[in-house]
A protein has these predicted regions:
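Active-site/substrate-binding loop(s) of hydrolase catalytic cores
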Residues: 1-134, 141-145
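Hard-cation-handling environments
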Residues: 148-200
Length: 200
């Protein structure tokens, strides 16, 4: 999974860029918020690999009480996972950027990034809104420089709702970033170019 590779790169990669990051940035990594749920999803995929059910979701909740909705519990903190992470974010470390890595992106894309679509909640400080868009623009530029197509922005997420892992940080004067990557399973997919959305 991506977080394991990221942790290794931050700790061991000797590129000039990563050395500079290590010297100037404190990075906290939560490898997975719901390890039991990850195991359920992985086991279901492996069990059904090569069958008509290969790209389906498990027929059970992958969190005993809330299923996937533990990622919508960031303002109520009903679940131990969100309670513990928010304690770290808002009472112990106070990070400048909170990055919430999700999957899956819209079916024909590789990653969705900020800037986000309108509307923006008027309770969010304009400097936070601008900073989120600035980080998204830097991400887009880097994808272009690395010749990595498939990134989209200004799509289906807004900055209005205030209950997600990306949006609650706004009210603590932190930059909240959410990306959605790939699709729901590791199985490669082909998307017919004729069926992709056309630009105007």
């Amino acid at each position: 999974q991506m977080t394991s590779e990221l942790a290794w790169r931050v700790a061991a990669e000797e590129s000039e860029e990563m050395q500079k990051i290590r010297e100037n940035v404190i990075t906290l990594i939560v490898p997975v918020m719901n390890p039991d749920g990850l195991d359920i999803v992985v086991d279901w995929y492996r069990k059904n690999l090569g069958t008509p059910f290969e790209n389906t979701s498990p027929p059970i909740l992958y969190q005993k009480y809330v299923g996937h909705d533990n990622n919508r519990d960031w303002f109520m903190n009903n679940m131990p996972e969100t309670y513990n992470v928010t304690k770290i974010l808002y009472n112990e470390w106070y990070p400048q950027i909170v990055y919430n890595h999700h999957q899956s992106s819209p079916s024909w894309t590789k990653i969705s990034i900020p800037p986000y679509a309108d509307p923006v909640n008027p309770k969010i400080h304009p400097a936070i809104t601008a900073a989120v868009s600035e980080v998204g623009s830097a991400m887009s530029k880097r994808f272009s420089l690395e010749n990595m197509p498939g990134a989209i922005a200004d799509n289906f997420y807004t900055m209005f709702w205030n209950g997600g892992g990306r949006t609650v940080p706004y009210y603590h004067n932190m930059i909240g970033i959410l990306t959605e990557t790939g699709h729901t399973t590791p199985t490669p997919r082909f998307y017919d170019p004729e069926k992709l959305p056309k630009t105007v």
